[in-house]
């Protein structure tokens, strides 16, 4: 270790303020397999060198503070401190740098996403020496991954539970999201499920409001599930949102869902919190419930390119905390999401081993050592004309979720569900025959319209609906 960066408590305590880079900028450091590695996009204040800014991030997110303290001598800072070990300028940005920081594993409580984030993205984001700060990616070491249960069941177990293979799953968010009575809500679910969807969904802000209390909703949705299963011979589900004001109330709702015998429940993991989410994921594994995760509030955290936390980090955190599905954007719909960035974190959700690939925004190689995978959910402003692109982009291990794209059908919910199911089956059949969905997608849908009046009506309604807005968060060139 460089004499400049070694913490020498033995020479005695010397009060005062010293530059962070003297202790926390260590370009000669060789990272360990057990280190948690972080890539930060740092925008220093004018006059602050990048080395000082990177070192400040490492210090303030580990053992450092603004001044020397005598209690430094009571421990080994060299063992516990974070280290900024590499800095690179961001192409095309005069004042932005990617600063790489290594954290020793001993800094983190086992199995706690809450503790990991409290350390890495805690006070440092308000640090005055930085104009902006964004956590772009984390490398979670194998030793830390193994302290997490992860998703309650994972992709293969879900397929086996549902007995559905070889195609994406279809879902629908019930609209209007607020204001329906429980009985009318259940009726809407039933119509969608009997029409051919695999799932219906509570919207993220449906909890237990005066117009529809949670217990009533659970009962009517369970009735819809069982009735549609009896009619279609397929296993159906509804994402019953168990999110609540307290963990105790959340668990009470999860227990009631299990007693009803439904296959899946739901949680808003960012607004509900990682501690609550991990507890719920453990309960779901122990009791055979699938867990659908909504990412409400994510864009507050991840949308701005130079400040916040990138969604690929939030996706990794969810895989550790636990969830069988998570919303991932659509690339083609109404919500933010560049194709290569989206496919990068979709791989981080589903695959077991993901190589570093900066062209898709992946800063580190990640080994999940067989932690179960998470199914990405494409949802937001999509309709039947998007089906070929969605099937091509997301593949079989995904949920394609059409809210307005089902309920907005001119003939009603069930025909809307039929249209989506026919479009999906046509795309899967064409893909399996070797046709190019990206090039022939519209033709495939038009061919299917000839033998499905429901699909033809849907195509007519949404033939001119597009969302042509550039993504805010794009890859560095």
UniProtKB/Swiss-Prot annotation:
Posttranslational modification: The disulfide bond which can form in the large chain dimeric partners within the hexadecamer appears to be associated with oxidative stress and protein turnover.
Chain positions with N6,N6,N6-trimethyllysine modification: 14
Chain positions found as N6-carboxylysine: 201
Domain of life: Eukaryota
Enzyme class: lyase
UniProt-annotated location(s): Plastid, Chloroplast
Residues found modified as N-acetylproline: 3
Main location: plastid
Record family assignment: Belongs to the RuBisCO large chain family. Type I subfamily.
Other facts noted in the record for this chain: The basic functional RuBisCO is composed of a large chain homodimer in a 'head-to-tail' conformation. In form I RuBisCO this homodimer is arranged in a barrel-like tetramer with the small subunits forming a tetrameric 'cap' on each end of the 'barrel'.
Stated name of the protein: Ribulose bisphosphate carboxylase large chain
Biological classification of the source: Eukaryota, Viridiplantae, Streptophyta, Embryophyta, Tracheophyta
